[in-house]
């Protein structure tokens, strides 16, 4: 079980990323466009740097939906590898079967 503070901090980051996503995309388009003048590009870069650090999507950590474990996360299920194994053995994941060959 992850610390509650870490889980809450990650949820706050998710909200911040969603709030700033549109403006970040606009600024990144201005910065990466070759037709943008140098002064406009510099202004866009400056504004992007002034945005909160946690508004960047790379700072969000995928966590287990049940207990918040940060490692061994499987995107398909939104769970950690251990939780997937546990639920699959119990038959609580629809369509998941133990492989045998």
Curated annotation (Swiss-Prot):
GO terms for biological process: translation. GO terms for cellular component: small ribosomal subunit. Binds 16S rRNA, required for the assembly of 30S particles and may also be responsible for determining the conformation of the 16S rRNA at the A site. This is Small ribosomal subunit protein uS14A. Keywords: Ribonucleoprotein, Ribosomal protein, RNA-binding, rRNA-binding. InterPro entries: Ribosomal_uS14, Ribosomal_uS14_bac/plastid. Part of the 30S ribosomal subunit. Contacts proteins S3 and S10. It comes from Mycolicibacterium gilvum (strain PYR-GCK). Residues 61-70 have a biased composition (Basic and acidic residues). The keyword RNA-binding applies. SUPFAM superfamilies: Glucocorticoid receptor-like (DNA-binding domain) (SSF57716). GO terms for molecular function: rRNA binding; structural constituent of ribosome. It comes from the Bacteria. The keyword Signal does not apply. Belongs to the universal ribosomal protein uS14 family. Residues 29-73 are annotated as: Disordered.
